[in-house]
Amino acid sequence: MSESQRHEAREDGFTTPHESGLSSEDAAELEELRREAAALREQLENAVGPQSGLRSARDVHQLEARIDSLAARNAKLMDTLKEARQQLLALREEVDRLGQPPSGYGVLLASHEDDTVDVFTSGRKMRLTCSPNIDVKALKQGQTVRLNEALTVVEAGTFEAVGEISTLREILSDGHRALVVGHADEERIVWLAEPLVSVEHLPDNEVAGPELDDDRPRRLRPGDSLLVDTKAGYAFERIPKAEVEDLVLEEVPDVSYSDIGGLTRQIEQIRDAVELPFLHKDLYREYSLRPPKGVLLYGPPGCGKTLIAKAVANSLAKKMAEVRGDDAREAKSYFLNIKGPELLNKFVGETERHIRLIFQRAREKASEGTPVIVFFDEMDSIFRTRGTGVSSDVETTVVPQLLSEIDGVEGLENVIVIGASNREDMIDPAILRPGRLDVKIKIERPDAEAAQDIFSKYLTEELPVNEDDLAEFGGDRSLTIKAMIEKVVDRMYAEIDDNRFLEVTYANGDKEVMYFKDFNSGAMIQNVVDRAKKYAIKSVLETGQKGLRIQHLLDSIVDEFAENEDLPNTTNPDDWARISGKKGERIVYIRTLVTGKSSSANRAIDTESNLGQYL
């Protein structure tokens, strides 16, 4: 190779064989490439004209632009290829997932030291192995587990949430099994799931007691409803008895004796019957005196029977707190308000079962010495005299159930039964005898003095009073309210023509005029005051004059009497005699004496008719 050729080769970027240390074959190939490069350079020099420099620069720019475009396109193709690869992998995973064999489920019965478990699945009890990912020691009896196609436990689930409802009869001695009663009184032994067993072994300070209804778990007791899987033979959960919850209202009422007006004598009677035995148990034991088991409050409607029962529970709780040295604000007592008519059920035996559950709950809450009052409102609706049923004979079994609960073999301690009724003559005599409902208190209609006391509970000094009425009594608000009450009571109880209501004719020919006052009640007095307050509000809106006036109360009395003119339209004569309380004769004829009534108001009373409001 000449010196000039070596120089050209260096300019082309090639090295000589001696410089590179190549083999003879590589050197020959390199020499061939040099010749080709020289020939191409010569062709290029021959082809380039005068404007070759400008054209070459333009071609370079075009090539660079094309290279950039191809590079961007290549990047997009790479991204598309990557996304397609990811989608392909996802589809492959989905195909693999869809192609997996189905998994089965079972209920864990027991676990063993060799990491095997007993599982109930597909109606069979089987011993299976567990996946290495499963902590066998963490599995709990009754828990749901997932099995693969090889019947290996691969996942631990929760406890079963659906099943049949059975009633707990008793827990067996081992503490892990229970006797339950299902449909058609079918008895069976079931295992208790881990949550139920753990509650049974909790310390007493971590378990809700009979007197507490908080969120803490409580131990099982006979009568509880359990969620049971009859096939697996497991009870998983305690289900609250909603049917009894709807019938029973557990609370400490906020009504005190000071909220009740016109019933001083009746309040004293019921306090002697209910509070003394609880507050002075030692004296009762010293005199061998048995506390009463029940109290009957009877009388016309709207006169405060339910109010007295609530006040008894409130007062009893506070007095017991004082005796124990507890805070009166945290006093505990229970007032089980039984909605009488809702106890009735079309299925035979259901009403009796509800009564048993109610008294069972009362005994549980009274076991810690906390007073419990079981209040039956409208007692005549469910405990009527046996044999008097027209369309059914349900009372023939309901009444004996109550009798056995009150004074049966299993006695009641710290439980008082209070019944309220405005048809005491319909209650079975066996319930009213001494030893059951010992104390019978009549809640009478208020007289003028009692009416003033009741008005004072609703007309208080905090109410806004009209300036004109205040000025009449020298601006003394207390005197103004007192005068209002006296005037409205005098108007309500005055034996004037405007207050005449009915003329009653008895079977012996005697006649008696009955006034609206003979049908007055605490509820009517409250309605009169509420109506007067409404008139005062309308007066503010219409005339701008603020405050309650005596005239508002007097107008309310007139309107209240007018609304009651047509109410006693179909009434049994014997009931009318009992309401009036003056004659024992049977009523054969009544005549309304309300001003403006036509002669059509005169009517004879049929002895077989429905009952009016006032009974």
From Swiss-Prot:
Binding locations of ATP: G302, C303, G304, K305, T306, L307
Region (Disordered): 1-32
Domain remarks: Consists of three main regions, an N-terminal coiled-coil domain that binds to protein Pup and functions as a docking station, an interdomain involved in ARC hexamerization, and a C-terminal ATPase domain of the AAA type.
Protein name: Proteasome-associated ATPase
Biased composition (Basic and acidic residues): 1-13
Gene3D superfamilies: 1.10.8.60, 1.20.5.170, Nucleic acid-binding proteins, P-loop containing nucleotide triphosphate hydrolases
Signal peptide bounds: none
Any one cellular-component term (Gene Ontology): proteasome complex
SUPFAM superfamilies given in the database record: P-loop containing nucleoside triphosphate hydrolases (SSF52540)
GO BP, one annotated term: modification-dependent protein catabolic process
Function: ATPase which is responsible for recognizing, binding, unfolding and translocation of pupylated proteins into the bacterial 20S proteasome core particle. May be essential for opening the gate of the 20S proteasome via an interaction with its C-terminus, thereby allowing substrate entry and access to the site of proteolysis. Thus, the C-termini of the proteasomal ATPase may function like a 'key in a lock' to induce gate opening and therefore regulate proteolysis.
Keyword terms, alphabetized: ATP-binding, Chaperone, Coiled coil, Nucleotide-binding, Proteasome
Functional pathway: Protein degradation; proteasomal Pup-dependent pathway
Gene Ontology molecular-function annotations: ATP binding; ATP hydrolysis activity
Region (Docks into pockets in the proteasome alpha-ring): 614-615
Subunit structure: Homohexamer. Assembles into a hexameric ring structure that caps the 20S proteasome core. Strongly interacts with the prokaryotic ubiquitin-like protein Pup through a hydrophobic interface; the interacting region of ARC lies in its N-terminal coiled-coil domain. There is one Pup binding site per ARC hexamer ring. Upon ATP-binding, the C-terminus of ARC interacts with the alpha-rings of the proteasome core, possibly by binding to the intersubunit pockets.
InterPro entries (UniProt xref): AAA+_ATPase, AAA_ATPase_domain, ATPase_AAA_core, ATPase_AAA_CS, NA-bd_OB-fold, P-loop_NTPase, Prot_ATP_ID_OB_2nd, Prot_ATP_ID_OB_N
Coiled-coil stretches noted in the UniProt entry, renumbered to this chain: 22-100
